[in-house]
Amino acid sequence: MTVIDTSDLEKHTPMMRQYLGLKAAHPDMLLFYRMGDFYELFYDDAKRASEMLGISLTARGKSGGDPIPMAGIPYHAVEGYLAKLVNIGQSVAICEQIGDPATSKGPVERQVVRIVTPGTLTDEALLQEKQDNLLAALYQGKTGFGYATLDISSGRFVVAELPTREALEAELQRTNPAELLYSEDFTDMLLINNMKGIRRRPEWEFDYDTCINLLLNQFGTKDLHGFGITDARLALQAAGCLMQYVKDTQKMALPHINSIVRFNQSESIILDAATRRNLELTQNLSGGRENTLAWVLDNTATPMGSRMLQRWIHEPLRNRQTIQYRHSAVSELIEQDLYQTLHEQLKSLGDIERIMARLALRSARPRDFSRLKQALTLLPEIQQTLAICQQPRLNTLVQLLGEFPEQHDLLERAIVDNPPMLIRDGGVIRTGYNNELDEWRKLSEGASDYLVELEAREKQQTGINTLKVGYNRVHGYYIEVSRLQSDRVPLSYQRRQTLKGTERYITPELKEYEEKVLSSQGKALALEKQLWEQLFDLLLPKLQELQQFATAAAELDILSNFAERAELFNYQCPQMSHDIGINIEAGRHPVVERVSQAAFIANPVALTPQRQMLIVTGPNMGGKSTYMRQVALITLMAHIGCFVPADHAQIGEIDRIFTRIGASDDLASGRSTFMVEMTETANILHNATANSLVLMDEIGRGTSTYDGLALAWSAAEYLAKNVSALTLFATHYFELTQLPELLPSVINVHLDAIEHDDTIAFMHSVQEGAASKSYGLQVAALAGVPASVIKAAKHKLHQLENRDMTLSQQNPTQVSMNLLPPIPEPSLALEKLAQINPDELTPKQALDYLYELKRLSHTNT
């Protein structure tokens, strides 16, 4: 790192003194320092930018006696470079020239006018249109964690109180923030170190009273009771820090952030981090979007609909009424044949949600207002399309769309049909909107007629037939004459520029007209900018209603999308039951059936309190994992309001979905594959309930055969006896197929395969009963394992089977059972003993406990 001597600023040049002062105020950010047509970076900023952006590192003379490392980028290309930087979690402070170079005696006055951080983006060019861009803050307390997220591009502000590390990990994965703020005393850095855009914040920013005042000021309320979050102390501390950061970086009012919502885990099906990862909901195991549930379900018409759909996928509902409202809305859109018309209308809306954020931040561009005008034009058509609907949710959404005739009329009168990108270019305000602007424009636009007239007049008076009148931005207006005829120009012509074959002149008349035209152009542009700012003032009073319009349109987009997916992919409306159980007829995996070249084999599943665990056996590649995942995905799809890939589905009450699927280590945490597997298994055994859906795949394969078998048997038995969760338990330990003989609620099913000689055909069909064998050697042969190895494996297999046969003859019915006896009942006496702290007991209390332990020991015998 370059050490910059700032103790004596007089050593540095005036420009570098200015730079160092601005850099000191933004030490953790790259400072883009405007120099003419470039943004320049110096010292360590230059070195880092050179590495991150692949730009040249040079030097700019010396200051304070030392060379100045420098890198630069053209100002007109800045958005592309900013996109690269924020994508890797880097923040940037943009410093512009705000003074007039003509009147500045020293360095031109400069000021940081914009701060760009990964979590506070609103610029369309920097955002991914189909993904929420969240700023998050995290605070650790004695009772758990406070967590807050803000999407500044929509104003969505959500807080949560999370009791455990596992809950926090799941929430971090669900929200996937672009930038995360955490306090100085946060201890579990292992959890967040691999995340992009993490920012350490001083402890005082999490001060409770300071945070409350910040939130009250933002919402303009006397207290927070109306938001239902007053008891969420840790969450409020996180929210307050987040709010402080946004105010510091945005440097303006934030009227679109007008409410705060508490995320309540009890209102949605809980999915832990492993489950979200294993089910590949919105991100596949490689980090991409292809072949995920969202990839299949998302044919939404608008970016805001796509983002809302991803939130729905990660927050499957438990509220039966809301789920059924969504299902019935989708049904009506199909029955009335409205979904295609609605989809086409919504496609023209654009991203109203993010346009509203830019309106609130006064950073909207002319084309944003043009899109808003188009959206408001379409609004009556959308409402007319849905006018025949009877379904309550659709009727509510039509009302929430609202009516904006005055705002539509304003934009229609004010904005031209195809405006330029930036207001600084002018030509945004429509002719007829403002009389004064029309007058200034008329004066400046009349220049072409005047120049034609002047050229004809001067040609006639001078007799110079090559004479031309023209204009360029550098030299202004001029009269051009070929060099051969330049000796014929009048004395009133003053030479302005000499070119290779021509001379250019100015006359007093042309100079006077130039000043008049340029003045009118400047005044027209200044007035146009003033009228542009007034449009914000006229639209902002309707901001909340316009945000509501965007939210309602996004939900309509999802519902019409669900209808389209159902018709295209032959999905059926699931029946939601209040009973415990899952009954699916001819279910299909929504992703695999779309990417598979062969016809997908549909399979049933029946899980009830009397049939609560299926032991799933069958060959490798037979489809066990696909079968289990499809049950979870169908269940989840039903709970977001989507139709499902099945002939019929009845889905009961579900509180959580757990998965223990796949094998991977966690090198960053120093955890082996087996340790990861056991950690996930422990989480399931501790937290699953009778209303949970549990998928367990190949438990115990990461250790020795007997250890693995013992763990798999015990985990399955515990889930069946102690938890009673609805469970799919896939295994290659055939000993587990004897569990149904001990536990009547456990059932064997298998994925069918047909063996012919040394080949195998996978039928992918689920049948009742246990599989006869695992076909591991046949699968190995298909994978290309050398024939000599397969031959040796067959020989070894026969040896092992003969040994097992000998063992079983000693006790043919009970050998496997005796190896794995049922789990003993927990000892009440030992549990009580574990709760006692002997250092805190009086003699009398110790004697009382001794009698109690004696009594409990008899209870267990």
Swiss-Prot record:
* Residues annotated for ATP binding in this entry: G618, P619, N620, M621, G622, G623, K624, S625
Pfam families, per database record: MutS_I, MutS_II, MutS_III, MutS_IV, MutS_V
Q: Which UniProt keywords apply?
A: ATP-binding, DNA damage, DNA repair, DNA-binding, Nucleotide-binding
Please list which residues make up the signal peptide.
none
Listed under GO cellular component are: cytosol
What is the role of this chain?
A: This protein is involved in the repair of mismatches in DNA. It is possible that it carries out the mismatch recognition step. This protein has a weak ATPase activity.
Name listed for the protein in its UniProt record: DNA mismatch repair protein MutS
The organism's taxonomy opens as: Bacteria, Pseudomonadati, Pseudomonadota, Gammaproteobacteria, Alteromonadales
Q: Gene that codes for this?
A: mutS
